A protein has these predicted regions:
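Structural recognition of the beta-strand scaffold that forms the well-ordered cores
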Residues: 70, 81-83, 91-95, 133-136, ...
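Enzymes and membrane/adaptor proteins characterized by extended Gly/Ser/Thr/Asp/Glu-rich
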Residues: 87-116, 295, 299
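Active-site/substrate-binding loop(s) of hydrolase catalytic cores
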Residues: 89, 104, 111, 117-286
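Zymogen propeptides
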Residues: 69, 74, 81-86, 109-111
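Short glycine/proline-enriched loop/turn "hinge" motifs that connect secondary-structure elements
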Residues: 84-86, 181-184, 199, 333-339
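Secretory targeting and sorting signals
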Residues: 1-22
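C-terminal accessory segments enriched in acidic
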Residues: 1, 27-47, 205-397
């Protein structure tokens, strides 16, 4: 949420080949408990870091127009991979797994990469028009214990930045134990609070502990790896056209369809272009003159339309609650620097068949990503009215 023994059949299924399940409404039995025998969500069916390495190697060896790289290492020394597909003038940066207990974006991203690197004519057109740069799993250390945070003690952090000795720990560092939004097994940082649009920022003790509406400090090697990749893309392309961050949200979020006497409908995904309550106070239009507000709204509309192409099964995409103020998020940081920034929060479907559940969520992510990519390939992106963003219904709660 913005605030692994893999299923091989899902991991290597193209965007077009995932079977559409039946329409889903928000039923109490689905929302209040898992089906009998399912228990809570587990790591089964999701990628472990070693499996990501094998997938990346397979993409490089069998895909067309694919290049891979290690953009950094996690705090525990695991490689963080990027996959590049295509050579077009427009660049799309896709990122998954920043919160490692929200893992279906990784499945979806692998599916999209497999599809776009195949020999079909459409994939060739995409590769000629667009450069896709993807980080399938930004937080490999969190994937091992299946937690939101990375694995990094405050002592680890002070060892990296001795100037922080004696200062309080950052507000987004957690010790093991239940939280409202998480239940870390090992100490670590919420990576999606560690970003800062000032790429030259150096951590300062006087800025600790910080708070939710202030910028991050790049205390984690994972956030720095994402920043460094983005910097390289800026240097190559001048502007990173689109940035997408893939997340999961709680199951059975709903929205009001506007019809009287009908129950609220279940939303398969919530999306957002809004990450700062007062962008100007963070330098939008001044220090960051390319602030991508209109472009972000266009990209969200393209994602919305992409999911609608999946038919009624995937109807009901909503806007994430529009009161975010998360200056330390990747979305806010890259939007300030000029990218069309999109948050995608697909719901964790609770269904008796785990393959159905994972496949449904991954498919929603895939359709949304391809909606954006197709609009760039077909040169319709700039024709999208950004004010249509307001037509997307807002999620309840």
């Amino acid at each position: 949420v913005f605030g692994i023994g893999v299923l091989a059949a899902l991991a290597f299924t193209s965007v077009a080949m995932v079977e559409s399940p039946s329409p889903v409404r928000a039923e109490p039995s689905q929302c209040n408990e898992f089906p009998e025998g399912q228990g809570s969500e587990t790591v089964e069916g999701y990628y472990q870091p070693a499996e990501i390495e094998r997938v990346v190697q397979q993409l490089e060896h069998t895909g067309q127009g694919v290049n891979t790289d290690v953009i950094g290492t996690s705090n525990q020394g695991r490689p963080i991979y990027s996959v590049r597909v295509g050579s077009g003038d427009k660049v799309v940066f896709l990122q998954a797994g920043i919160h490692a207990n929200e893992p279906t974006g990784t499945i979806a991203l692998v599916n999209v990469l497999k599809s776009l690197s195949d020999s079909s004519r459409r994939s060739q057109q995409v590769r000629e028009a667009v450069t896709i740069v993807a980080v399938p799993q930004l937080n490999p250390d969190g994937a091992v214990p299946y937690q939101r945070e990375n694995h990094q003690t405050w002592d680890d952090t002070v060892a990296m930045f001795p100037q922080l000795a004696g200062a309080p720990s950052a507000f987004y560092h957690s010790l093991p134990g239940p939280r409202f939004w998480s239940d870390p097994r090992v100490p670590g940082f919420d990576l999606n609070r560690d970003f800062n649009p000032d790429f030259d920022y150096a951590p300062q003790a006087g800025h600790l502990p910080g708070g939710g509406s202030v910028r991050g400090m790049y205390l984690t090697p994972e956030a720095r790896a994402s920043r460094d990749l983005y910097t390289e893309l800026e240097q190559e392309f001048g502007l990173v056209d689109v940035f997408v961050d893939l997340h999961n949200q709680a199951p059975c979020n709903t929205f009001d369809d506007g019809e009287a006497h009908t129950p609220d409908l279940h939303t398969p995904m919530s999306i957002s272009a809004q990450f700062l309550r007062d962008p100007g106070s963070h330098g939008a239009g001044t220090a960051y003159p390319n602030f991508g507000w209109d472009a972000s709204r266009r990209a969200n509309v393209a994602a919305w339309e992409g999911v609608q192409r999946g038919g009624s099964t995937f109807s009901g995409v909503t806007r994430y609650p529009q009161n975010l103020d998360l200056a330390g998020s990747a979305n806010a940081t890259y939007q300030l620097r000029g990218s069309a920034s999109v948050l995608m929060e697909a719901g964790r479907q609770r269904h008796a068949n785990p393959q159905w559940r994972h496949g449904f969520i991954a498919k929603v992510h895939e359709l949304a990503m391809m909606g954006i990519i197709d609009s760039l390939v077909d040169n319709t992106f700039e024709d999208i009215d950004p004010y249509r963003y307001e037509e997307i219904p807002v999620r309840n709660g």
